[in-house]
From Swiss-Prot:
The keyword Protein biosynthesis does not apply. This is Envelope glycoprotein G. Residues 329-342 have a biased composition (Pro residues). The keyword Membrane applies. It comes from the Viruses. Residues 290-377 are annotated as: Disordered. Belongs to the alphaherpesvirinae glycoprotein G family. It comes from Suid herpesvirus 1 (strain Rice). Residues 271-329 are annotated as: 2 X 22 AA repeats of E-E-[DE]-[AE]-E-L-T-S-S-D-L-D-N-I-E-I-E-V-V-G-S-P.
Length: 498
């Protein structure tokens, strides 16, 4: 009985690990779909979001190919009171020393004992903050995170739900099959910008490999041209700025990259204090300075001057290179406005006027040290609010999926990923500009099966236990056979002696 109990428990563990949630097929389409639901305004940031709190619950998920995944919060709030509350939903990626914000949305007037949704929250919902990074986009379906994972998206995802004054934190560990033989290439993901990021060991392709696994609807580019950011559930000024924020905690040696403070009156930001952004690429001039090379002996000729102009730089010239940013100077960024006061629960019969939180991306970025103790910051201070045109906002962008005025899915993701993989990749690093050349390498010497470590470990344990049971049964059978053989021998001896 004890062995049976252990085997049953291990079987349930394996089932829990293997069960994965692929996004419903109705979310896979590449054309805009309108309905009557509209966000009521920008997020108020009245409920603090702390991704550093201890987890209340954990879960696992496993993705393969170009699937659209729907990560559900592994949290249960059914024991709460059903009284209406405002709810904030925020998803993060655990980057180790920092928690990378992915999406953020507020719901108003929601039942306190259920997950928020646009159907059940009578006060409406806010614009959605979403991160676009390294060919990957994220979206919310009510409280669940939608993404199309690549090899660099494997890791721990954090969800924070704030119901009134009560905060809940859950984690989902996502594993991704290590196989490149898919239309989307699989070489994308959030951690690809990390220094020294490398591909995991790639498993060989099996004979029954389903290469076209995933979401690949046809895309109507013309239908997306007139779609506004507000229709996607995003702020109206979404496409006008790219502002980088990140939330770090570990110690006061860590830094926060955020909006640069406004320069004091009478002072100007110097070039040494400014950091390059991607908009400076077109205004970069490279000049070689230092002592001019000695002219060659003899009279100068037109051919000689032409040869000097065509002369290539050598390694000795590297110490004499200056990079100068030319063009009109950029005005310093203005300080962001303070977050508005905590809102009251909203109803359909009340009008609310909201100003748009706008960050100026033209100012320089500076490094600011955190205080020794971790502090709460508003989501507007830790989220990436990127630029983009409607044609590049992939199918499941923003707040559109099955819960917003315009339903967008991951349908366009595969197409844009394939197109983007043919272009040079510009990688933004926090606090400055980093150019990276991607070298594609494939490791075919490994025999990894592509299963996650938890799955393999559970299977190995079950197989080992089953083997022990079989060995025990065999030993018992042999023991009984030996006893019977001895009994027969004793009987023969007794008959012979008689």
């Amino acid at each position: 009985m004890k062995w049976a109990t252990w085997i049953l428990a291990l079987g349930l563990l394996v089932v829990r690990t293997v069960v994965a949630r692929e996004a419903p097929r109705e979310l896979c389409y590449g054309h805009p779909v309108h309905d009557d639901r509209r966000p009521v305004g920008p997020a108020t940031d009245a409920q603090p979001v702390n991704p550093l709190a201890p987890a209340n619950a954990t879960g696992t998920d496993y993705s393969r190919g170009c699937e659209m995944r729907l990560l559900d919060p592994p949290l249960d709030v059914s024991s709460r009171s059903s009284d209406p509350v405002n709810v904030t939903v925020a998803w993060f990626f655990d980057g180790g020393h920092c928690k990378v914000p992915l999406v953020h949305r507020e719901y108003y007037g929601c039942p306190g004992d259920a997950m928020p949704s646009v159907e059940t929250c009578t006060g409406g919902y806010s614009y959605t903050r979403t991160r676009i990074d390294t060919l990957m986009e994220y979206a919310l379906v009510n409280a669940s995170l939608v993404l199309q994972p690549g090899l660099y998206d494997a890791g721990l995802y954090i969800v924070v739900l704030v119901f009134g004054d009560d905060a809940y934190l859950g984690t989902v560990s996502l594993s991704v099959e290590a196989n490149l033989d898919y239309p989307c290439g699989m070489k994308h993901g959030l951690t690809i910008t990390r220094p020294g990021a490398t591909l995991p060991p790639i498993a060989p392709t099996a004979g029954d490999h389903q290469r076209w696994r995933g979401c690949f609807p046809s895309t109507d580019e013309g239908a997306w041209e007139n779609v506004t950011a507000a229709e996607k559930g995003l702020s109206d000024d979404y496409a006008d700025y790219y502002d980088v924020h990140i939330f770090r905690s570990e110690s006061d040696d860590e830094v926060v990259h955020g909006d640069a403070p406004e320069a004091p009156e009478g002072e100007e930001v110097t070039e040494e204090e400014a950091e390059l952004t991607s908009s400076d690429l077109d205004n970069i001039e490279i000049e070689v300075v230092g002592s001019p090379a000695a002219p060659a002996e003899g009279p100068a000729t037109e051919e000689g001057r032409g040869a000097e102009e065509d002369e290539e730089l050598t390694s000795s010239d590297l110490d004499n290179i200056e990079i100068e940013v030319v063009g009109s100077p950029r005005p310093p960024a203005s300080s962001p406005p303070p977050p508005p006061p905590r809102p009251h629960p909203r109803g359909r019969d009340h009008d609310h006027d909201h100003g748009h939180h706008r960050a100026d991306d033209r100012g320089p970025q500076r490094h600011h040290r955190l205080p020794p103790e971790p502090t709460f910051v508003s989501p507007s201070d830790i989220f990436v609010t990127p630029t983009g045109s409607p044609a590049l906002l992939l199918g499941f962008l923003g707040s559109a999926l099955a819960s917003r005025p315009l339903h967008l899915t991951a349908g366009e993701t595969a197409q844009h990923v394939r197109e983007a993989q043919q272009k040079s990749r510009h990688i933004r690093s926090l606090g400055g500009l980093q150019l990276s050349v991607e070298t594609e390498t494939t490791n075919t010497t490994t025999t990894q099966t592509g299963l996650s470590g938890d799955i393999r470990t559970s299977i190995y344990i079950c197989v080992a236990l089953a083997g022990l049971v079989v060995v025990g049964i065999v030993i018992m059978c042999l023991h009984m056979a030996i006893i019977r053989a001895r009994a027969r021998n004793d009987g023969y001896r007794h008959v012979a002696s008689a």
